Amino acid sequence: MCIRDSHNTSRLHLCRTQFYGRVLWDACINGSSELMTNLSMSLVNILYNFQLLRLAGENGVAAYGVIMYAAFLFVAVFVGYAVGSAPIVSFHYGACNQAEVHNLYQKSLRLIAVVAVSMTAASMVIIPYVARIFVGYDAQLLALTSRAFRLYALSFLIMGFNVYASSFFTALGDGVTSALISFLRTLVFQLAALLLLPALWGIDGVWLAVTAAELAALAVSVYMFVTKDQKFHYRHG
């Protein structure tokens, strides 16, 4: 029912709306990957701090804090591109423009590969300078942070593909696949790596946990890219 005045000639009117529960549910499912990412961060950070306190004391926690601040600058590049390109993918998929979806998919993977290598190389160069800004007052802590950052930065080679995979399936309306990638990547694989790797390599295992988790998640992302192509047809246009 529309509420309109007899003298109102506008095409826009106030109307009594309906509650579309199915649409709301689908939107929640499609955005569940972002929910899982944010929920898992707290749990993973708690375990990181626990392991670092056990293996390296307060210096380990301080080094981790520096790494998180610096790493966010690199991770933001991947997240920004994935989130920014998602509406374009959604638009062309909704318009049944499979050729353009294929084009976006192929070019995005190539771009992410180039950026991943470039950022990893850049991070290796700037690590000493970034660490010195935060912990230059302590030579031992500076050495620990620099080494930790170098090990952690290896994850930049892989991370972008997983971030993009999760966002890409969200853009296609496949929230379940997107959430699965995000859940495994940010919680399950990281928790497993944080529990297993320190037992093998000590504190280096803590710094390598994120790379191991991203590598395992990459296998899942590749599997989903291959199998879901039968439904969405983005690999061959």
Where are these regions (language model features)?
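Hydrophobic faces of transmembrane alpha-helices in multi-pass small-molecule transporters and flippases
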Residues: 16-47, 52, 73, 77, ...
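Short runs within selected transmembrane alpha-helices of multi-pass transporters and secretion channels
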Residues: 79-82, 152-171, 177-187, 193, ...
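Alpha-helical transmembrane segments of multipass membrane proteins
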Residues: 46-51, 73, 121, 164-168, ...
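Hydrophobic alpha-helical transmembrane segments in multi-pass membrane proteins
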Residues: 34-46, 50, 79, 111-124, ...
